[in-house]
Amino acid sequence: MATYLDFEQKIKNLQDDIESAIISGDNDAISILEKELEKEVSSVYSNISDYQKLQLARHPDRPYAMDYIESILKNPYEINGDRHFKDDKAIVCFLGKIGEQTTMIIGEEKGRGTKNKLARNFGMPSPEGYRKALRAAKLAEKFHIPILMLVDTQGAYPGLGAEERGQSEAIARNLQEFAKLKTPTIAVVIGEGGSGGALAIAVADKLAMMQYSIFSVISPEGCAAILWNDPSKIESATKALKITPIELKKCGLIDDVINEPLIGAHRDKESAAKAIESYFLKAFEEISQDDNYLNKRYQKLMNYGAFS
């Protein structure tokens, strides 16, 4: 059953009415209701607020990394473990083909269903997850295989064990090593891009965001609690943080925005997957034809935070 957000209630009601009209065989009513639905969808999504985009980024039906991997990667071969401690299921690494291009995909996976979510720690990676990602990236570099990174986490796991095993070192190491990888790298924020937990697999030649994704140094709830001592001020915090793709592109922090189906990737996962596949192949072709891409990546990273 589809999940609707609070601002989509009228859309839900119209779709329910259409289903009832279909059951009763009232073709005239179906035609009228479909036009009303199209008008309502256009009205709602053409005036969507930053807070509503946050809700869409967190939508429970939104495609996760594994959804995209299963859709766009042919002949997938999974890489497990960091060769130091364990296999962190919050990070997934697969080697396969996108189109005819051999590709390494590294993604953050939140999981579906209670058991799977617990196994994947709700998409919050531990140090061994980031070390597994680096292991996969180094393997790709060895054979000059392009890397596609799918970013989707509320943040790195803040537990005591993760800190004891070097969470901050693992993130910092990835920032350093991914910046130097001698192979084309493309990162796409597909849902939530939460602070260092997202950055650890987001250093790339091209950094894009899905239309209804977010990227932030802190959650809006955390920001509201710190600045106003009131977590209920989440809407104000969301706007102030400028966490949406449009705002981040204006600031020069991301390269591109990937358009989603009108009412979100969760309503048409196949189209969303095709959009990511198309973006990756186009970006890879552009990067691979540029002999100076490593220097351009370095210059891009050095320009972060610089304003004239």
Curated annotation (Swiss-Prot):
Residues 36-286 form the CoA carboxyltransferase C-terminal domain. Component of the acetyl coenzyme A carboxylase (ACC) complex. First, biotin carboxylase catalyzes the carboxylation of biotin on its carrier protein (BCCP) and then the CO(2) group is transferred by the carboxyltransferase to acetyl-CoA to form malonyl-CoA. Its EC number is 2.1.3.15. It is found in: Cytoplasm. GO terms for molecular function: acetyl-CoA carboxylase activity; ATP binding; carboxyl- or carbamoyltransferase activity. Acetyl-CoA carboxylase is a heterohexamer composed of biotin carboxyl carrier protein (AccB), biotin carboxylase (AccC) and two subunits each of ACCase subunit alpha (AccA) and ACCase subunit beta (AccD). Belongs to the AccA family. This is Acetyl-coenzyme A carboxylase carboxyl transferase subunit alpha. InterPro entries: Acetyl_CoA_COase_a_su, ClpP/crotonase-like_dom_sf, COA_CT_C. Pfam families: ACCA (PF03255). One of its GO terms (biological process) is fatty acid biosynthetic process. GO terms for cellular component: acetyl-CoA carboxylase complex. PROSITE patterns: COA_CT_CTER. Pathway: Lipid metabolism; malonyl-CoA biosynthesis; malonyl-CoA from acetyl-CoA: step 1/1. The keyword Lipid biosynthesis applies. It catalyses: N(6)-carboxybiotinyl-L-lysyl-[protein] + acetyl-CoA = N(6)-biotinyl-L-lysyl-[protein] + malonyl-CoA. Keywords: ATP-binding, Cytoplasm, Fatty acid biosynthesis, Fatty acid metabolism, Lipid biosynthesis, Lipid metabolism, Nucleotide-binding, Transferase. It is an enzyme of class 2 (transferase).
